[in-house]
Amino acid sequence: MYVRHLGLRDFRSWAHADLELGPGRTVFVGPNGFGKTNIIEALWYSATLGSHRVGTDAPLIRAGADRAVISTIVVNDGRECAVDLEIAAGRANKARLNRSPVRSTREVIGVLRAVLFAPEDLALVRGDPADRRRYLDDLATLRRPTIAGVRADYDKVLRQRTALLKSVSGARFRGDRGALDTLDVWDSRLAQHGAELMAARIDLVRLLAPEVEKAYQLLAPESRSAAIAYRASMDAFVAADDAAPDRVTLEEGLLAALAARRDAELERGVCLVGPHRDDLELRLGDQPAKGFASHGESWSMAVALRLAAFALLRADGSEPVLLLDDVFAELDAARRTALARVAESAEQVLVTAAVLEDIPSGWDARKVHIDLRDSADGRVSVVQS
């Protein structure tokens, strides 16, 4: 799989861009702040419908514009597929697949399968559980695009149940049985969709665990062994080598946990149980990586998680595109060498770097120089001719 063409309209600092790409390695070179990362961000958005830098779409639209457009042509096993995404301010985003409109933007997920390495990856180890949940969900969705619908259904039920908790927090004191019966209905829906999302995550962690261990050993052979496990908010800890619980068991566990925490939830007006509060636990030896790993160990764990994702996507039979956003500048020589070795085997690698010296020596790569210029549209990113 590779991206043959990337077009941008009013995306971040790019008023207009048409980039012809191909298999092999391409390096986007330019000073920081000139728009290199915006290219990688656009490709990642095309793959996942999300940015690795911000949680909302508004910052993706260039100042003064009312929408941004990302257009890609992806070649997979000799077949081309065109994806056009329109990111709109204040209204629903739109998508086209091979120039035909689709009902939901989620229908384009899976066309481009990519693995992103970025400086923000350190948050996978040192950041909040939300960063690790997003890592799992993005990867699960790339492997099984229907998971995007599962996530959307769960998030919708979670919002509605949380709103109900806030509105009926006094119902138990007033004896309003009807309001509490309504909460029972939403408990059931939350457990149903939550169990489906948890099952997908747990299955993914079981597949990731040996790949993470292997990748970490490659990156840091002198360090402690690495391990991952899924820790659920319903007082359940699911190690990677445990038998995967089925959806029925997970649903029953969620219902029981919701019943046990109901008083606390009504008192606080928030949902305290569910996959939105779960975590991917990362361990080095017998200690959690967060809080105990050194800077080098943290980077090794973060890169190992991405390498494991690459291995899983490749094992599925479709070579993912590697996106490396200024990551070589963050790594020491040993980790750069290990990552470069993996990158050399990929069908397409798209890299950003402030200076060419950040790129591994001996790499045969096409260089694309990025500049920032004043225009009628303000200061915009351009490709040097």
From Swiss-Prot:
<dbReference type="GO" id="GO:0003697">
    <property type="term" value="F:single-stranded DNA binding"/>
</dbReference>
<keyword id="KW-0227">DNA damage</keyword>
<keyword id="KW-0742">SOS response</keyword>
<keyword id="KW-0547">Nucleotide-binding</keyword>
<dbReference type="GO" id="GO:0005524">
    <property type="term" value="F:ATP binding"/>
</dbReference>
<dbReference type="InterPro" id="IPR001238">
    <property type="entry name" value="DNA-binding_RecF"/>
</dbReference>
<dbReference type="InterPro" id="IPR003395">
    <property type="entry name" value="RecF/RecN/SMC_N"/>
</dbReference>
<protein>
    <recommendedName>
        <fullName>DNA replication and repair protein RecF</fullName>
    </recommendedName>
</protein>
<dbReference type="InterPro" id="IPR027417">
    <property type="entry name" value="P-loop_NTPase"/>
</dbReference>
<feature type="binding site">
    <location>
        <begin position="30"/>
        <end position="37"/>
    </location>
    <ligand>
        <name>ATP</name>
    </ligand>
</feature>
<keyword id="KW-0963">Cytoplasm</keyword>
<dbReference type="GO" id="GO:0000731">
    <property type="term" value="P:DNA synthesis involved in DNA repair"/>
</dbReference>
<comment type="function">
    <text>The RecF protein is involved in DNA metabolism; it is required for DNA replication and normal SOS inducibility. RecF binds preferentially to single-stranded, linear DNA. It also seems to bind ATP.</text>
</comment>
<dbReference type="GO" id="GO:0009432">
    <property type="term" value="P:SOS response"/>
</dbReference>
<dbReference type="InterPro" id="IPR042174">
    <property type="entry name" value="RecF_2"/>
</dbReference>
<dbReference type="GO" id="GO:0006260">
    <property type="term" value="P:DNA replication"/>
</dbReference>
<keyword id="KW-0234">DNA repair</keyword>
<dbReference type="Pfam" id="PF02463">
    <property type="entry name" value="SMC_N"/>
</dbReference>
<keyword id="KW-0067">ATP-binding</keyword>
<dbReference type="InterPro" id="IPR018078">
    <property type="entry name" value="DNA-binding_RecF_CS"/>
</dbReference>
<keyword id="KW-0238">DNA-binding</keyword>
<comment type="similarity">
    <text>Belongs to the RecF family.</text>
</comment>
<dbReference type="GO" id="GO:0005737">
    <property type="term" value="C:cytoplasm"/>
</dbReference>
<keyword id="KW-0235">DNA replication</keyword>
<dbReference type="GO" id="GO:0006302">
    <property type="term" value="P:double-strand break repair"/>
</dbReference>
